[in-house]
Amino acid sequence: MATPAGGRPSQPQPQAQQLSVDFEALSYISSLVEAFQAFDSDNDGLVTAPELRGLLASLGLDKPEHEVRDMLARADADRDGKLSVEELLDVMNAGQLGLGALGALLQSAVPALESAAGPDGVLGADELARLLSVMGTASVEDCMEIIACMDGDGDGAISVEEFRLMAQLL
């Protein structure tokens, strides 16, 4: 071990742990959330059986009405006859995709991102990259890919609200 001029051996610096992100899984979850929001016709955060059927069809999963009703009955944890986005992700096995570490990182970044966002509440890849790179957990390329996966309209940015929702759902 090297000895600096002060005479004491230098201590090894802890390495920032790199985040391993399955971008395909993140993109899948993001597409489920976007489809959910598109089919939640009254914007109450819940989908009914007909809305669920349309949502599934939009994802290429055209199911007969009875299968959709069975799926809703199995996934409806609070038995209100509707599915929340969390219940949808559960029934679609999104929780088994191993994105918990990313979710924890994103949740810890939300307060700083709120202050980093522009006046319109929108985050670009550069804001996310700057913050997560400082946290030492994600490369700029990873941050750009995260934004791309979560960017529903393709403008290269996401709102703080969308970011917060995805962080909570992961």
Swiss-Prot record:
InterPro entries registered for this protein in UniProt: EF-hand-dom_pair, EF_Hand_1_Ca_BS, EF_hand_dom, EF_hand_pair_protein_CML-like
Domain EF-hand span(s) in chain numbering: 27-62, 63-98, 138-170
Function text: Potential calcium sensor.
Binding-site residues for Ca(2+) 1, renumbered to this chain: D40, D42, D44, E51
Stored CDD domains: EFh
Keywords annotated in UniProt: Calcium, Metal-binding, Repeat
Biological source species: Oryza sativa subsp. japonica (Rice)
Binding residues for Ca(2+) 3: D151, D153, D155, E162
Residues bound to Ca(2+) 2: D76, D78, D80, K82, E87
Descriptive protein name: Probable calcium-binding protein CML29
GO molecular function: calcium ion binding
Gene3D superfamilies: EF-hand
